[in-house]
Amino acid sequence: MTTQQLHEQILQKKSFLCVGLDPDLSKIPAHLLETEDPIFEFNKAIIDATHDLTVGYKPNTAFFEAYGIKGWMSLQKTINYINENYPDIFTIADAKRGDIGNTSSMYAKAFFEDLNFDSVTVAPYMGKDSVEPFLAFENKHTIMLALTSNEGAFDFQTLNTNGTELYKQVLETSKTWKNSQNLMYVVGATKAEYFADIRKIVPDSFLLVPGIGAQGGSLSEVCKYGMNDKIGLLVNSARAIIYASKGTDFAEKAREEALKVQQEMAEIIDSKF
C-alpha cells in the first residue's frame, strides 16, 4: 500500500484510527476458549466489528509468539483474513525488530513476503545497516521507534548528546538513509509536547501514535501538534477497544469504543480540511 492510498482511506472513512490486536487468553471472553483457535476467533470478531471505522490493524507479535507455533499460526490466519476480506486496511506487524544486516533481511522477508504485512515496526539502536534491509521493499513501510510512550523512554531517548536530544538525532540521521521515503515513525501520544519539534524534522512522514485510551494520551493534543497537511497520523488504540467487554457482546462493545474515537477524529478532520 502506498502512503497516498492510506491518505485516501483516511479521508474516505474520516478516521486515522489503528486498532491494536493484542490477544491475551487470560482476558478474551471465556466462550471463545472453547473454539479451535480462540485467538483468531477473537481477532476476527474485532476486525469484522470495526473495519469500517479504522484504517489500520496492528497485531503485536509478542501476544502471538507467547503461544508458540499455535500463536504464530493464529497471526498468519489473522493477517490473511484482513488481506483477503478488507484489502484496503493498512496492516502493521508490531514486532520491533532490528539486527545485523543479514538477520534484518530475513525479518523483512518474513513480515513483508511471507506474512504480507504493509509495514513493520523496527528498533534503530543498531543503526543504518539494521534498518535499510526493511526499506528496500517497494510499497512496504518501516515504522521506526523515535519517541515512545513508556516511562522508560526518558532513560535514553531524550538524553542530550552533542547539544541535541538523542531521538532528534535518530530522526535526522534516518532521513539520510537509502529509501528513507519508506520510513514512518513511532511517537507516543503521552509525549504530545514533543510533536511540534518532531514535525520540524519530519514534516511529511506518517507517525504511528500509540498511547491513546488505556495509556491516557490526548487525541486533541496529538492532532494539534502532530497533524500535517495530509493528516499524517495513525493513532493506535488497543486495550480500550478490544477489551471493552469480556462477555459475548465483546465485539459490539469494541465497535462502540472504536466509534467514539472515530467520531472525534471525524470532527477534527472536518474542522481542519
Curated annotation (Swiss-Prot):
NCBIfam families: pyrF_sub2
Gene this chain is encoded by: pyrF
Active site residues according to the UniProt entry: K96 (proton donor)
GO molecular function: orotidine-5'-phosphate decarboxylase activity
Record's catalysed reaction(s): orotidine 5'-phosphate + H(+) = UMP + CO2
EC number(s) from the headed UniProt entry: 4.1.1.23
Biological classification of the source: Bacteria, Pseudomonadati, Bacteroidota, Flavobacteriia, Flavobacteriales
Protein name in UniProt: Orotidine 5'-phosphate decarboxylase
Pathway, per record: Pyrimidine metabolism; UMP biosynthesis via de novo pathway; UMP from orotate: step 2/2
Gene3D superfamilies, per the entry: Aldolase class I
Family designation: Belongs to the OMP decarboxylase family. Type 2 subfamily.
Protein species of origin: Flavobacterium johnsoniae (strain ATCC 17061 / DSM 2064 / JCM 8514 / BCRC 14874 / CCUG 350202 / NBRC 14942 / NCIMB 11054 / UW101)
